[in-house]
């Protein structure tokens, strides 16, 4: 009888607690990925805003060309190495799908998703909005982290105290870092990724996190669907 009491919450809560036919997380992940231009880099905050994206990519095959970066994981060397390797352009004769257990190089943009970047009357009626592209779709020519294993390990052991505010130039952007805190490894790698990728790939931040603010690049963001795109330069120029 005592153990049966434990079943009471299950029975009473099941009708509203079940996730059957609840597609909100899946749809949110799909829409966020489809807010990003081909071969984009997308910074997320943590598990809750990342796992729906990974599900969409790995289970449904949606926008596998997008590199999802979990900022809370960037403080670990294995994750930095993984990002470097999976964004490295594939050498001639090598396919990113040849190893079923891991991603070994940059996965290609799937042209079957091109309907997102054009607009027809049917799409407009269905609420689909085209994303304007400012350049032709082309594969990236370099990884997002161009550091060897030793350099990555050195970054992981570096915690910089910000005694005073500093500005860091990344591309045509001036990132403003406030005083009074620490510059953690993920901050350093995040700025490195932006600096190395801003002319090679579109860079985005999920609307669910504050990574752009912590990296000091928030004034350069433009809303695009469920993501914020980082503009390489002054928005008012």
Q: What are these language model-derived features?
A:
Residues 1-41, 51-237:
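ER/secretory pathway lumenal C-terminal domains and tails of membrane proteins involved
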